[in-house]
């Protein structure tokens, strides 16, 4: 069975946002605080498609104060 990397990416970021109790609106505010300006539509599209860059992923993790990510497969 082939790995669906887009689905894994989407799941990874959504899990971390859920753990931090942060929705898209709050994420957008927090991203702006670190100098990253995104729209709701842009954030939702990137996350739901699972096609965001690793830079975007790191920015999101910084915005929710997540310093360590463990990927298990």
Segments from the language model and where they lie:
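Recognition helix of helix-turn-helix/homeodomain-like DNA-binding domains
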Residues: 33-51
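Short acidic DE-rich linear segments
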Residues: 3, 72-73
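DNA major-groove recognition helix of helix-turn-helix/homeodomain DNA-binding modules
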Residues: 53-70
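Residues within the alpha-helical elements of helix-turn-helix
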Residues: 30, 34, 63
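A short, Lys/Arg-rich alpha-helix, primarily the initiator
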Residues: 1-26, 30
């Amino acid at each position: 069975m082939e790995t669906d990397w887009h689905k894994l990416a989407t799941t990874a970021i959504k899990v971390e946002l859920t753990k931090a109790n942060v929705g898209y609106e709050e994420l957008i505010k927090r991203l702006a605080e670190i100098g990253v300006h995104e729209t709701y539509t842009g954030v939702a599209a990137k996350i739901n498609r699972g096609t965001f860059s690793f830079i975007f992923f790191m920015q999101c993790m910084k915005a929710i104060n997540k310093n360590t990510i463990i990927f298990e497969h």
